[in-house]
Amino acid sequence: MAGVKALVALSFSGAIGLTFLMLGCALEDYGVYWPLFVLIFYVISPIPYFIAKRVTYDSDATSSACRELAYFFTTGIVVSAFGFPVILARVAVIKWGACGLVLAGNAVIFLTIQGFFLVFGRGDDFSWEQW
């Protein structure tokens, strides 16, 4: 039952993050849909971790070069997702209020992604490895 509660909480927080993102795009004062490109960063952020998990066979090691490289690429993707709306606001493509909403959505979504891996990455019966 704890897995179901965690899944519901993660779904709720993901919906809140996407709501912030949509508000940053669709409010009448903002009305520009360029910030939706951060959805690409949401999709590609866990890919380096998945690849490193498949390639790394020694799970007992405290560190491996492949895993560290995956963390580096994931960090670059996350920083790019936070930098993209700031750059759009700096060149006046979007307004700073929309940038704030997108940054709030980014924080919620990336914390949701991290929470997903913390909750379901244990390797028990109900985990993301089955998906």
UniProtKB/Swiss-Prot annotation:
For this entry, list what GO says about its biological process.
late endosome to vacuole transport via multivesicular body sorting pathway; negative regulation of growth hormone receptor signaling pathway; negative regulation of protein localization to cell surface; negative regulation of receptor signaling pathway via JAK-STAT
Report membrane topology: Multi-pass membrane protein
Q: Where in the cell is it found?
A: Golgi apparatus membrane; Endosome membrane
State the conditions that upregulate or repress this gene. Answer: Down-regulated by insulin.
- Transmembrane regions listed in the UniProt entry: 7-27, 32-52, 69-89, 100-120
| Keywords of the record | Endosome, Golgi apparatus, Membrane, Transmembrane, Transmembrane helix
Q: Which domain of life is it from?
A: Eukaryota
Q: Does the keyword Transmembrane helix apply?
A: yes
> Disulfide connectivity?
none
GO molecular function list: signaling receptor binding
Provide GO CC annotations from the record. Answer: endosome; endosome membrane; Golgi apparatus; Golgi membrane
Family named by the database record: Belongs to the OB-RGRP/VPS55 family.
- What does the record give as the function of this protein? Negatively regulates leptin receptor (LEPR) cell surface expression, and thus decreases response to leptin. Negatively regulates growth hormone (GH) receptor cell surface expression in liver. May play a role in liver resistance to GH during periods of reduced nutrient availability.
How the protein assembles, per its UniProt entry? Interacts with LEPR. Interacts with RAB13.
**What protein is this chain from?**
Leptin receptor gene-related protein
Which organism does this record belong to?
Answer: Rattus norvegicus
